[in-house]
Regions:
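Phosphate/NTP-binding elements of NTP-utilizing enzymes
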Residues: 94-483
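Protein-protein interaction interfaces in oligomeric scaffolds
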Residues: 2-95
């Protein structure tokens, strides 16, 4: 049986063990504090050295570059590489605290400088509803690359205007931007506006849900419950409380969302000029972005009538770009002009009575405006791949406008040149068909024909006559006023 002395000895032993443990913990804490202090000093020195070299690195990056857009991209690249280097060096300097160094490197690492087109090429899938199912390939529609890349987070462009013919992929570029914002940026609210709430529910929502289901990186961000919930017709929540707000331009209430940095307006030429007695919907939309300096807006539409076409007015305020492609014979660049250089040949059905005979287009080609050689549609794929956008007003840097017609439709993904020529032939002597052709196939505004007076010439004929002078001359018979609406 243990004696009192045995109990006292055991108590002393346990006290000694506890004292040693406390001492070891104090020493470890002191060492950890010293290691942390040394790591913090090392990181501080790295940051101070990096800040000191920024001016030289920036000057070296842009060198003699004068293009504002290129300067923006080059500076972004310089900052990106500098932050990555700091992260690596900090991890090495904090070898005594590997977890601290790893966390600092991870926290200082910037997002990849990914463009919208690069994101689409990596992550976008289209399984149905297209002539080219499978993984998205920007190379099939190369004219969309610059349009999408202007919407990238590190692009200096804040407004992108696309005036286009139907069936050229403009709306798919919009969906790629949505996917880019959801997956790559992850925390940016976005407002999508279509002409009406009915169109939102009938067309946009199903297409958006389809894209999310087809892209694994997007479907992972959106819960199945939120996608099927009845109260999600106007808002899609994803990721860390980010939202896509879906509105109709015919509803002022739907445009009263919280402030958002990014806005996409599809088919803007179909928007009403006043909504709900509250004025222009485009003004209401712009008000949602006013608190953001790094905002982006996409305006996408086929045009309508001259003088009342929103997309045409927006394009005229932009830098006005057209897609130029090289002639396969002489190599000179030109934009494809339907009215002046597009040619076709027709044949008349001989087995039909003269009054019912129909002209059938049997061939179509393009004539180079530089060398006069005939360009066949089979040359178009290589021409599109080598094409480039050329601005009429290159001095406008932040508002990029793109105009493109149906002649550029990739082979197998749209109307052929023969199809377009046939639609032109069929539209003759029918103003409604002709208007649809001009708007949807040429991507141009429809101009009503008539004998209206030129405004400038009319104003030049204005003269002032006082009532007294006319009465004195005995020439005042009556005053007539009229208006023509």
């Amino acid at each position: 049986m243990p004696t009192l002395a045995d109990h006292q000895t055991e108590k002393a032993r346990l006290q000694a063990i506890a004292a040693k443990r406390e001492f070891d913990e104090a020493v470890a804490a002191t060492r950890a504090a010293d290691d942390l202090r040394q790591a913090a000093l090392a990181v501080r020195d790295l940051l101070m050295a990096a800040l000191a070299e920024i001016p030289e690195r920036f000057a070296e990056a842009i060198a003699s570059e004068r293009d504002e857009t290129r300067v923006h991209y080059l500076l972004s690249d310089a900052v990106h590489s500098l932050l990555e280097r700091i992260g690596r060096q900090a991890e090495q300097a904090c070898a005594a605290l590997p977890e601290f160094g790893e966390r600092f490197r991870h926290g200082s690492r910037p997002r990849d400088l990914l463009t919208v087109s690069q994101w689409a090429d990596r992550h976008r899938w289209i399984t149905s509803g297209t002539n080219a199912p499978g993984k998205w390939r920007t190379e099939l529609t190369p004219y969309l690359r610059d349009i999408m890349d202007d919407l990238s987070e590190h692009s200096p462009v804040d407004t992108v205007v696309v005036q286009k013919a139907s069936g050229l992929g403009g709306t798919e570029a919009l969906y790629n931007w949505i996917g880019y914002d959801m997956h790559h940026l992850g925390n940016r609210d976005m407002l999508i506006v279509v002409p009406t709430l009915e169109l939102r529910d009938r067309s946009f929502n199903p297409r958006l849900a389809k894209m999310i289901d087809e892209c694994p990186v997007l479907s992972a961000l959106v819960s199945r419950a939120s996608r099927s919930s009845a109260n999600r017709v106007d808002i899609l929540e994803y990721g860390a409380n980010a939202r896509i707000i879906k509105a109709g331009a015919n509803s002022a209430d739907s445009l009263r969302s919280d402030h958002v940095p990014n806005v996409a307006c599809d088919e803007v030429s179909a928007y009403k000029w006043s909504v709900g007695g509250e004025g222009d919907p485009m003004t209401l939309i712009a008000n949602r972005q006013r608190t953001f300096t790094r905002r982006k807006t996409l305006l996408n539409s086929t045009p309508t009538n001259e003088g009342e076409c929103r997309i045409d007015q927006a394009y005229k305020r932009s830098n006005r770009q057209r897609y130029h492609v090289p002639c396969p014979h002489c190599g000179e660049y030109q934009h494809l002009d339907f009215r002046n250089n597009f040619k076709y040949r027709t044949a008349i059905d001989e087995d039909i009575s003269p009054g019912d005979q129909h002209k059938t287009v049997v061939a179509a080609w393009y004539v180079c405006r530089h060398c006069g050689a005939e360009i066949q549609e089979g040359d178009k794929t290589a021409m599109l791949a080598a094409g480039r956008w050329i601005a009429e007003r290159p001095y406008i840097k932040r508002r990029h406008g793109y105009q493109i017609n149906g002649l550029y439709a990739p082979i197998g993904l749209g109307l052929t040149w023969v199809d377009i020529a046939q639609r032109w032939v069929d539209a003759q002597n029918d103003s409604t068909k002709l208007q649809a052709f001009v708007n949807t196939d040429l991507g141009e505004v429809w101009k009503e024909e008539g004998d209206g007076a030129d405004a400038t010439s009319l104003l030049a004929r204005v003269e002032n006559y006082s009532r007294e002078s006319l009465e004195a001359a005995g020439r005042l018979l009556r005053v007539v006023a009229w208006t023509d609406v």
